[in-house]
Amino acid sequence: MTEPETLALLEVKGPETLEKSPPQALVPNGRKLEGEDEVESLGAESSRVGSSAESPTAREGTEDGLDSTVSEAATLPWGTGPQPSAPFPDPPGWRNIEPEPPESEPPTKLEELPEDEASLLPEKAARAFVPIDLQCIERRPQEDLVVCCEASEGEHRRTFLPPRATHPEPPECKWAEAVVKPPGHSCGGCGGCGGREALRAVASVGAALILFPCLLYGAYAFLPFDAPRLPTMSSRLIYTLRCGVFATFPIVLGILVYGLSLLCFAALRPFGEPRREVEIHRQYVAQSVQLFILYFFNLAVLSTYLPQDALKLLPLLTGLFAISRLIYWLTFAVGRSFRGFGYGLTFLPLLSMLLWNFYYMFVVEPERMLTASESRLDYPDHARSASDYRPRSRG
């Protein structure tokens, strides 16, 4: 182009074209952004004034210049179609710049337009306006691929992770929680309830320690029966075993109740979750069997050392065992700390018999500790007392 043509173009566009205008939003034909009507009206008035001041020769020059620019653009080697976007090299220091978070802008009229009106744009104008997103430029496809891979790996790890093994609580904890607390008593977590329970248990055992000799002496003195004459060791052992049959009654009763509880609560699986209503009877039966073995083993040994007048203690100790086990069973099922009373009535006679046997074995008759000789009733000093023995008459 010639110099007069370029000067005419600059005069038409005005000095505003020298400054870099900000990027305009994409607006279809016939639509204008809000706030631009006033600017365009002012520009139109200024252009009218300038055009009126110009000479007609300048107008002709501008028209010729526009035609020449169109002709030159038509002769360029590339067409009017959309050009492929070539990757531009990143300027230095581009990666060190952190992208600012996009501010929430009010929706433009293009977003509010329906699809029918948005399709009114010509194809060439739609190709010319390409929206640019800084976030898309900043994040390359390779980085997107890495992020997607990391997210998929995290999901796969979560799916293949084994579930955490839960440790089941011991049955004792479940029973303690299942016990119904009396109304009006609340525990604040200070540990005072545990101390009270311990004091009650100790007090119940102390009560058994006091009542055990009193009950045994009262039954020995006031019950109207006597033991038969048992001069030999074998006869005494047989008498003790026959008395022990009565002591099995609470154990057999506990086994029956345990079987019924298994049927009633459908707890027939041996390795299933234990139920409180079933475990109470099972523990009672197991503990009673253990105490029965220890109790009557010591009672049989005691029968070989007792004199004839004291053989009445054998059935009395047997009855005390049966009654004490029933008391313990009842208090254990209710869940009270007073069950120590029933346990004490079983354990304290057992401990007394053990100490008596040790006393006779090591102090009174150490020569007969491990021998099977007859009782001292067969000795010459005790023959007269044995012959003079007469059962006591009752009332």
Curated annotation (Swiss-Prot):
Its main location: other. The keyword Transmembrane applies. Residues 1-115 are annotated as: Disordered. Residues 1-204, 266-290, 335-343 are cytoplasmic. One of its GO terms (cellular component) is lysosomal membrane. One of its GO terms (biological process) is regulated exocytosis. GO terms for molecular function: identical protein binding. Contributes to the epidermal integrity and skin barrier function. Plays a role in the lamellar granule (LG) secretory system and in the stratum corneum (SC) epithelial cell formation. This is Transmembrane protein 79. It comes from Bos taurus (Bovine). The gene is TMEM79.
